[in-house]
C-alpha cells in the first residue's frame, strides 16, 4: 500500500459518506414531494400551528435571491456550488479524519450543495417544501439541502470561537 493511499484513508475525505447520505436523503424527499403533493400554496399541508409542508419551485438561491431573473442565475449558482464543493473537498483532504467537527461541517455543506445543484441541472429550479411561519409572517420555504448548508456554515462559524489547542513550544 502506498503512502498516498494511506494518507488518503486518514484524511477528512473519509467523511464524504455523510455528504452522500445528505444528497440521497435530500433528493429522495424532493422526489416524494414532487410525486405526491400538488404545487403551490393552495395545496399546502398544515402540520403544526407554525409549520406547513408546501411544494414550490425556487429559481434563485437562498430566500429566492435573484429568482426573478431570466435564468442565468441557475448557472451562476451551479458554478458557485461546484467551486465551493471543490474547495471544501480540498480542505477535507488536508484535514485528518479525526477532526470530526470541521469534516462534518464540510460534508454537510457539500451534500446540501450537490443536492441543490442536482435540482438546478435536472429541473431548472430547486424544490422547496418546508414552510415555517409565525402569525402571517412566513420564512421563505426551504429544504433539507438548505438546512444542512446552514448547519455546516454555522459549525464553521462556531469553530472560529472554539479554543484552539496551541502547538507545544520548541525550546
From Swiss-Prot:
Catalytic activity: Release of signal peptides from bacterial membrane prolipoproteins. Hydrolyzes -Xaa-Yaa-Zaa-|-(S,diacylglyceryl)Cys-, in which Xaa is hydrophobic (preferably Leu), and Yaa (Ala or Ser) and Zaa (Gly or Ala) have small, neutral side chains
EC number: 3.4.23.36
GO MF term list: aspartic-type endopeptidase activity; endopeptidase activity
GO cellular component, one term: plasma membrane
PROSITE patterns documented for this protein: SPASE_II
Active site: 128, 146
Annotated function: This protein specifically catalyzes the removal of signal peptides from prolipoproteins.
NCBIfam families per record: lspA
The name this protein goes by in its record: Lipoprotein signal peptidase
Organism: Vibrio cholerae serotype O1 (strain ATCC 39315 / El Tor Inaba N16961)
Amino acid at each position: 500500500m502506498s503512502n498516498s493511499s494511506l494518507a488518503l484513508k486518514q484524511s477528512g475525505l473519509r467523511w464524504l459518506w455523510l455528504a452522500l447520505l445528505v444528497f440521497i436523503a435530500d433528493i429522495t424527499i424532493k422526489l416524494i414531494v414532487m410525486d405526491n403533493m400538488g404545487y403551490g400554496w393552495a395545496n399546502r399541508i398544515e402540520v403544526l400551528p407554525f409549520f406547513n409542508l408546501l411544494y414550490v419551485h425556487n429559481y434563485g438561491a437562498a430566500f429566492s435571491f435573484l429568482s426573478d431573473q431570466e435564468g442565468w442565475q441557475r448557472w451562476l449558482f451551479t458554478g458557485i456550488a461546484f467551486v465551493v464543493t471543490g474547495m471544501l473537498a480540498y480542505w477535507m483532504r488536508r484535514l485528518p479524519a479525526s477532526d470530526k467537527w470541521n469534516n462534518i461541517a464540510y460534508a454537510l455543506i457539500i451534500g446540501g450543495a450537490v443536492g441543490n445543484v442536482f435540482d438546478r441541472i435536472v429541473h431548472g429550479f430547486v424544490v422547496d417544501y418546508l414552510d415555517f411561519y409565525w402569525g402571517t409572517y412566513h420564512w421563505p420555504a426551504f429544504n433539507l439541502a438548505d438546512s444542512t448548508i446552514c448547519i455546516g456554515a454555522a459549525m464553521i462559524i462556531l469553530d472560529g470561537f472554539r479554543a484552539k489547542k496551541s502547538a507545544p513550544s520548541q525550546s
